[in-house]
Amino acid sequence: MFWRDITLSVWRKKTTGLKTKKRLLPLVLAAALCSSPVWAEEATFTANFKDTDLKSFIETVGANLNKTIIMGPGVQGKVSIRTMTPLNERQYYQLFLNLLEAQGYAVVPMENDVLKVVKSSAAKVEPLPLVGEGSDNYAGDEMVTKVVPVRNVSVRELAPILRQMIDSAGSGNVVNYDPSNVIMLTGRASVVERLTEVIQRVDHAGNRTEEVIPLDNASASEIARVLESLTKNSGENQPATLKSQIVADERTNSVIVSGDPATRDKMRRLIRRLDSEMERSGNSQVFYLKYSKAEDLVDVLKQVSGTLTAAKEEAEGTVGSGREIVSIAASKHSNALIVTAPQDIMQSLQSVIEQLDIRRAQVHVEALIVEVAEGSNINFGVQWASKDAGLMQFANGTQIPIGTLGAAISQAKPQKGSTVISENGATTINPDTNGDLSTLAQLLSGFSGTAVGVVKGDWMALVQAVKNDSSSNVLSTPSITTLDNQEAFFMVGQDVPVLTGSTVGSNNSNPFNTVERKKVGIMLKVTPQINEGNAVQMVIEQEVSKVEGQTSLDVVFGERKLKTTVLANDGELIVLGGLMDDQAGESVAKVPLLGDIPLIGNLFKSTADKKEKRNLMVFIRPTILRDGMAADGVSQRKYNYMRAEQIYRDEQGLSLMPHTAQPVLPAQNQALPPEVRAFLNAGRTR
């Protein structure tokens, strides 16, 4: 310890203070004369001050204790004290703190043997020492901070009481921290220790224990509700630590009671009276369902009741006795369930019904079918024919065979009448007949392009040329809304008759035809399932079909079909699949050798070139509609879009009937957004 240097420090103070502070000389001499010799094991002090300036007193104590003192200019006051017995260093330091406390000041120990003198009210924000349990290093008026854990009492309720016991000078402070249930005390060590002792005496758990009371007939939740209602008013003026607590355990059908022995005994007797066996014949209840269909829940509830009955009989040792009879029936017209069961099983079934009879979320599914196609066909050919020399004809591409064309032209020419005289002199006059144009008309009906015929004597040449360009851009957006886990089907198209068989009678007249109808158009079938969060799993079947044309046998259909299962987030656009098709081909029919001659060879051949390109993509986007507000928002957007289209067409009018009004959807109430209107409508129905 540094106390062996006290005498030297005091004499050094006396030597340096003779010139500037003569009035301190008696005090310094008194302190020096009252101190023990240098070789003493422990220094002792006596104090004799009368109307001494407070700053001088502080400086004297700092010199005696070999401490550096920091104090502001506002420190002022007078000190008068006289000790009758010698004081050791700790007693001397406590005397110093007591005198400062009486003057409204406190000492904050700093590093390097520095003492800081501050106002008592400002000491609580200084870096005070943090003490723990059983610490003896600080006592008296030393400023400290202590954290006290509280185990059985709420610090929120205890803190206001402790604040009333803090000194009035404002040097102390009490802060409670609810998450850890601890109290932080700041102030003089003696006050902090006194508050700690108060906390320890108050912080007792009391004679409270928990008791589990199993039930035989009643429902645990119902019994707990009744007991809570009975004890609610009677325990209003009791502290929280003395109030009884009642909790229902649905899993074991038991009631847990916490409190003192008298309270638990009272609750036990009351529970036994309430847990009496009821008449089983009249234990029936009707449950009116809000969202589910009663017929769909009957099978589920029968399975659940069977499991509950078996478990109860096994627990009671009455397996197979048939004592527990459960009956579940559905009323289709009122959408209600009629359940007859013992009370405990009835409560379990009621809980299951409440969890199943909930409003299921809906999913609005939008599909986007995009098809962009373009094609180009070019056909050029020359055919020759001679009545006597033969012919050169081609049938590739869109060429009309020259032989078939010549025969059709011959049939189309009118025939001039003739006069025939028989051997017996009879005269027969045949009238003029018109030509048959049906063959020629049928032949030309399927032709497009240019056909030029050149006739020279017995020779005829047919030159045909055609170019076809096609382009298409198709966007189909079928959409449908369905419940979660509910299959939905959407179809827009037509029924096309298809000949599947024909039976001819014995006289080969009036054949019997068998016709089936095939649906063509846009079809969407989807079953959504809402998963954890906002993910939607969808089982999708999508088809686009149309009539492509007709052959000599039957109708040709074009189909684009897709079947898959995907997972998408709410509002996310996901591609299901697609096709990118690019085709190019050429067909050449020619006369050998002659068709290979440059330039001239084109007179002896027919060429058909074809190029087609098609891009097909299918997208889908699910939107979860968890409540009426979301459903109304989607419906209003669709409704307003269709109404805007109708208003636009009505403004355009009909060219030949300009004054004819066209149908337009009625206007909706646009004063409020659809979400707000849905919320207000839901409130009116409550």
Swiss-Prot record:
The main location is membrane
Region (N1) spans which residues? 142-206
Where can this protein be found?
A: Cell outer membrane
Region annotation Secretin: where it falls in the sequence: 360-627
- Provide the leader sequence positions: 1-40
Family annotation (InterPro entries): Bact_Secretion_Sys_Channel, GspD-like_N0, GspD/PilQ, NolW-like, NolW-like_sf, T2SS/T3SS_dom, T2SS_GspD
Q: Where is this region: N3?
A: 282-357
**What GO biological process, any one, is recorded here?**
protein secretion by the type II secretion system
Residue segments, region N2: 207-279
- Keywords carried by this UniProt record: Cell outer membrane, Membrane, Protein transport, Signal, Transmembrane, Transmembrane beta strand, Transport
Region of interest: N0, contacts GspC2? 41-140
Q: Name one GO cellular component term.
A: type II protein secretion system complex
Q: Where is this region: Cap gate?
A: 414-433
Q: How does it assemble?
A: Forms a cylindrical channel with 15 subunits, each of which interacts with the surrounding pilotin AspS2 proteins (also called GspS-beta). Interacts with inner cell membrane protein GspC2 in the periplasm. Forms multimers in the outer membrane. The isolated N0 domain forms dimers that self-assemble into rings.
NCBIfam families recorded = type_II_gspD
Q: What is known of its domains?
A: The N0 region interacts in the periplasm with GspC. The S domain interacts with pilotin AspS2. The N0, N1, N2 and N3 domains are periplasmic, while the secretin and S domains form a channel that is partially inserted in the outer membrane. The cap gate extends out on the extracellular side of the channel partially closing the channel. The secretin domain forms a double beta-barrel structure; the outer barrel has an outer diameter of about 110 Angstroms while the inner barrel forms the central gate with a small pore in the closed state.
Q: What other comment is given for this protein?
A: Encoded in a type II secretion system (T2SS-beta); this strain encodes 2 T2SS but only this one (beta) is expressed under standard laboratory conditions.
Family as reported in the entry's similarity comment: Belongs to the bacterial secretin family. GSP D subfamily.
Its name, as the record gives it, is Secretin GspD 2
**What gene makes this protein?**
gspD2
